[in-house]
């Protein structure tokens, strides 16, 4: 999915909520801390990671969620 932002960046946990992949901030935080989120093809466990236009975020939980978010 493509997500457009109007700011310079968006924090990783906020992106997961904004995109609808995570229903709440606590679920977004859990996904990140458990290692289910990758940032530009590398696992990222920093919920405050700044995501800029052109970056790709993937959430992958085998058998449950497999979503790639492209920030524009």
Where are these regions (language model features)?
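Absolute protein N-terminus
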Residues: 1-2, 72
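C-terminal structural segments of small proteins and small subunits
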Residues: 46-72
